[in-house]
A protein has these predicted regions:
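Regulatory cytosolic signal-relay segments
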Residues: 1-55, 142
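Conserved, well-folded catalytic cores of nucleic-acid-processing
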Residues: 42, 114, 118, 132-135, ...
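Cytosolic regulatory/linker segments at or just downstream of nucleotide-handling modules
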Residues: 193-221
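Catalytic core of nucleotidyl cyclases, primarily class III adenylyl/guanylyl cyclases
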Residues: 92-124, 138-182
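Catalytic NTP-binding/metal-coordinating core of nucleotidyl cyclase/transferase enzymes
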Residues: 50-127
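Alpha-helix/helix-capping structural signal
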Residues: 64, 164-165, 185, 204
């Protein structure tokens, strides 16, 4: 697997063939191990420009029931629960070329179409959301057994919206590289309205990813 988009070369990121590239500092990115460090250079551009406007899709996923559960669990158990949740979300997001932008308590925020560009970024976000649900269904059974919990208390609610947003470094005393704008706020509201094990998408997401959402219903937020 390589980073075709930036270098237009099939750069191997793993195995013996990756050794020569690693000598030049080209290795799997910390943002997404399926991309290389060349992609990280895009963030340098963003930092210098302060912000970049781009069409993108934002996904929020939240672990339902976490606040109540955390009050009855040991710190180690809470840590294990969050680590497992973050890992399953990250794997699904990276599989569809998304950027895991933030982990916020019991929630994650992902951006699709930055820095890895794709015309199908909205479809990718929808597929990543479904993959998160599938992966978590399996993981939470194991967690429920090991932590003596009711697996039904560990559902995930997901919200998705797409459109123009600003990506850059914001803040004065504490600078934060992230996406902001109406798209982000709307995706967050959709996630808040989603029930456990539910994915809510907006009308614009439905319009762009209709073929992946057959039988689904869009809602206004």
């Amino acid at each position: 697997m390589g980073c075709w988009q930036q270098l237009h070369l099939p750069v191997p990121l793993r195995g013996v063939l990756s050794v020569p590239f690693r000598a030049f500092g080209i290795r799997p990115s910390r943002m997404n191990p399926n991309t290389c460090t060349i992609c990280e250079l895009m963030f340098t551009t963003v930092m210098r420009a302060r912000k970049v406007s781009t069409d993108a899709t934002v996904l929020f996923a939240d672990l339902r029931g976490y606040t109540t559960l955390s009050q009855s669990l040991s710190p180690d158990a809470v840590s294990a629960l969050l680590d497992a949740f973050y890992d399953e979300c990250a794997g699904a997001i990276w599989e569809y070329d998304g950027l895991l932008n933030k982990t916020i308590g019991d929630a994650v925020m992902a951006v699709f179409n930055f820095p890895i560009r794709s015309e199908d970024h909205t479809r990718h976000a929808v597929r990543a959301a479904r993959q998160i649900q599938r992966r978590w269904q399996v993981a939470r059974k194991t967690l429920a057994e090991s932590l003596s919990l009711d697996g039904g208390d560990l559902g995930v609610g997901i919200g998705i919206h797409c459109g123009e947003l600003s990506f850059g470094e914001f803040g004065r005393s504490h600078r934060d590289l992230t996406a902001i704008g109406t798209v982000v706020n709307t995706a967050s509201r959709a996630q808040s309205a989603a029930g456990a094990d539910q994915i809510l998408v907006t009308q614009e997401v439905y319009r762009r990813a209709r073929s992946d959402l057959a039988g689904s219903e869009a809602k206004a937020y």
